[in-house]
A protein has these predicted regions:
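Conserved GNAT-fold acetyl-CoA-binding loop/helix
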Residues: 44-68
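A short helix-loop-beta-strand connector motif used in the catalytic cores of GNAT acetyltransferases and
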Residues: 61-83, 141-148, 166-170
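Conserved beta-hairpin
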Residues: 76-101, 177-180
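Conserved acyl-donor/pantetheine-binding loop and adjacent beta-alpha core of acyl/acetyltransferases
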Residues: 92, 100-175, 181
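Conserved GNAT acetyl-CoA-binding A-motif
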Residues: 167-169, 196-210
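Conserved acetyl-CoA-binding loop-helix of GNAT-fold acetyltransferases
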Residues: 176, 182-195
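Conserved active-site alpha-helix within GNAT-family acetyltransferase domains
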Residues: 183, 187, 199-202, 212-234
Length: 242
C-alpha cells in the first residue's frame, strides 16, 4: 500500500512539472505576482478580514498594498522570489503562483551586497517613492490601526529562529491563483525552500508561519515539526523541517 501511494505521489509531481515551470522571478514578474496574490489573499483572514476590512469598496487598493511589499522585498538580497508559470492557449507564459522565501541567519547576511555596490541604492529609493505615493494615495481598504498586523506577527516569531534553527530558509509568503489550487503548484513553491535547505546541509532548516488549516499542506512539503504558535485572532503555527 505504501509503495502504491509513493508511486501515485511521484506521478503527481511529474504531472505538475510537465504542466508548470518553476523558476526564479524576474523584475518583469512583479505585477503578475501581485495580481496572483491579490486574487489568492483577497478573502484571507489576515490580509483580507483583519488588515483590509474595506476591500470590497476599494479592491484595487489591496493589489497596490501587495505590490508595494513585493517591490521592496524583491530588492532585499536575503529574499528570493520564486514563480510557477504555465502557458495559456496563445502560448504566452502566465504566472499562476509565487513564493517569497527569505534566508535567515548568517547565511542571509552573507547575501547582502557590499556597501559600495550601486544596487544598494535601489531599495531605499523604492521605499521613499512608495512612502510619498502612499501619502498621496492612501490605502482606503485598510484598517490603519492594523496595517502592520502581519509585520508584527512575524517580528513576534523571531524567537523561533534561534539555536539549531538560526540558519533557515523561511517561507515568508506563498500564494496560488484559485484556478490553479489543488494542482501541485503550491507544493512546487513550498518544496523549493525545503530543497535549498537540504542542499546547504544539516545546519540549515526550512520553516513557515501558517494557519492551523494549512498544517497538512505544508506537512506534505516536509515542514512537519511544530515549534510554536500564536493564539487568538489571526493566530497560527510555526512549522519547521526539524
Amino acid at each position: 500500500m505504501d509503495a502504491t501511494l509513493d508511486a501515485d505521489a511521484a506521478r503527481m509531481r511529474d504531472d505538475a512539472s510537465a504542466i508548470f515551470h518553476l523558476r526564479e522571478a524576474q523584475l518583469s514578474d512583479l505585477t503578475s505576482i501581485a495580481r496572483v496574490w491579490h486574487t489568492a489573499f483577497f478573502n484571507d483572514e489576515i490580509i483580507g478580514d483583519i488588515m483590509h476590512p474595506h476591500r470590497q469598496q476599494h479592491p484595487e487598493d489591496v493589489y497596490w498594498f501587495l505590490l508595494r511589499g513585493i517591490r521592496e522585498r524583491f530588492w532585499n538580497w536575503r529574499h528570493r522570489f520564486i514563480v510557477v508559470t504555465t502557458h495559456n492557449g496563445k502560448g504566452a507564459e502566465t504566472v499562476v503562483g509565487a513564493a517569497d522565501w527569505r534566508r535567515l541567519g548568517t547565511g542571509g547576511a552573507q547575501r547582502d551586497l557590499l556597501k559600495v555596490d550601486p544596487r544598494t541604492l535601489i531599495a531605499p529609493a523604492i521605499r521613499t517613492y512608495q512612502a510619498i505615493s502612499l501619502r498621496i494615495f492612501p490605502n482606503r481598504a485598510a484598517d490603519t490601526s492594523r496595517s502592520s498586523f502581519l509585520d508584527t506577527a512575524v517580528a513576534d516569531s523571531e524567537k523561533y529562529w534561534t539555536g539549531d534553527r538560526a540558519e533557515c530558509w523561511d517561507l515568508h509568503v506563498c500564494g496560488v491563483h484559485p484556478d490553479y489550487q489543488g494542482k501541485g503548484v503550491g507544493k512546487l513553491l513550498a518544496q523549493w525552500g525545503v530543497q535549498e535547505a537540504e542542499k546547504e546541509g544539516p545546519g540549515t532548516c526550512a520553516s513557515v508561519l501558517c494557519g492551523e488549516k494549512n498544517r497538512g499542506f505544508y506537512g506534505k512539503a516536509g515542514l512537519t515539526v511544530q515549534v510554536g504558535g500564536r493564539k487568538g485572532e489571526g493566530g497560527g503555527i510555526a512549522l519547521f523541517t526539524k
